[in-house]
Regions:
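Generic structural signal for well-ordered, non-membrane alpha-helical segments
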Residues: 86, 126-129, 133
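Active-site donor-binding loop signature of nucleotide-sugar glycosyltransferases
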Residues: 106
Length: 142
């Protein structure tokens, strides 16, 4: 029932919007069951752990095996201490064959905004997170 509902709603929306963002849990249920239409861009998001990057790599490989091949697939690494990936994580990104779209630094202000119910779009213009996200959007050409 839920899968059919998601599929129906996405189909209704796709003719009205230039972009549709579908946030999946760490898995491929919506893709493997054919619920979502073909997408142009698949953005995999991981924390900065090696295991998280490995999971993103497995999802990218599964997408390929299911013949679900977006025009572009990339990785965003989120909540990175000081905004700097360590050598082990960078090595794992290379090992997984993932394109790094960007790194979003850890920021306590994002946590506080969430606690206060404020959208992160209201972060100050000089916020490192806002700057990182704007860079990723620019890199994607959105």
């Amino acid at each position: 029932f839920v899968n059919g509902l998601v599929q129906t709603q996405v189909q209704k929306l796709q003719s009205h919007y230039p972009y549709i963002v579908v946030d999946n849990e760490a898995g491929m249920e919506h893709i493997s069951r054919g619920i979502l239409p073909m997408m142009e861009v698949a953005i995999l998001v991981s924390d900065c752990s090696r295991r998280g990057v490995q999971a993103a790599g497995r999802i990218a490989k599964l997408m390929n095996e299911l013949n679900f091949k977006p025009q572009k697939t990339g990785l965003i690494v989120n909540r990175v201490p000081d905004g700097k990936l360590d050598a082990g994580t960078l090595e794992e990104i290379r090992n997984q064959g993932l394109e790094l779209l960007g790194v979003v630094p850890h920021d306590d202000q994002v946590y506080q905004y969430d606690c206060d119910g404020k959208p992160i779009i209201q972060l100050p213009k000089d916020s490192p997170v806002r700057s990182a996200l704007e860079g990723i959007v620019k890199k994607l050409g959105l």
